[in-house]
A protein has these predicted regions:
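The short coil/loop that forms the "turn" connecting the two helices of the helix-turn-helix
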Residues: 42, 56-59, 70
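Charged, amphipathic alpha-helical coiled-coil/dimerization segments
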Residues: 58, 80-138
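N-terminal leader segment of winged-helix/HTH proteins
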Residues: 1-40, 128, 135-138
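Basic amphipathic alpha-helical segments that dock to polyanions
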Residues: 50, 64, 82-85
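Residues within the alpha-helical elements of helix-turn-helix
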Residues: 67
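Residues that mark the N-terminal boundary/hinge immediately upstream of a DNA-recognition element
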Residues: 43-45, 60, 105
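Pre-recognition alpha-helix immediately N-terminal to the DNA-recognition helix
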Residues: 21, 48-51, 110
Length: 144
């Protein structure tokens, strides 16, 4: 017979689990940013992906996947709708045919330019709700 977990443990996890609180906070922030990005036709994840491609030289997939904390398969799936909309292109790396470069197109740059002021305003609003956003940011980065 398996040992049952006491009901009190449910409250312990609810009240103290850092993973649970991080998940809930991430979902709340994602929902908030999704709502404000809707008028420009982006989700919060798409904004982050486009921003990660906003570089002088198109990056290969691997560093972008690392930055966004996703595997290449997930990144490929996330790129598909952006490719269909003409915001991103995936090109063969001329220096190494096995690699792919991720190119932010001009329409991608334009939509990103419209989204950045929205991000700034919403981000400022979120930071104003926090007691110490810089400490929170450092602590979140430390977990990575």
């Amino acid at each position: 017979m398996s040992k049952l977990v006491p009901f009190e443990t449910t409250f312990e996890v609810r009240d103290t689990c850092l993973c649970l609180h991080a998940q809930r906070a991430a979902r709340a922030l994602a929902k908030r940013f999704d709502a404000v990005f809707r008028p420009v036709g982006l989700t919060n994840g798409q904004f982050s992906l486009l921003m990660s491609l906003n570089r002088p030289v198109p990056p290969p997939m691997a560093p972008v996947a690392r930055l966004l904390a996703m595997d290449r398969t997930t990144l490929t799936a996330a790129l598909k709708p952006l490719e269909r909309r003409g915001l991103v292109e995936v090109r063969v790396d001329p220096a190494d045919q096995r690699n792919r470069l991720l190119v932010l197109t001009n329409p991608g740059r334009e939509i990103l330019a419209r989204a950045v002021p929205i991000w700034r305003a919403t981000h400022q609003s979120v930071e104003e709700e926090l007691i110490d956003p810089d400490t929170l940011r450092r602590e979140l980065i430390a977990v990575l």
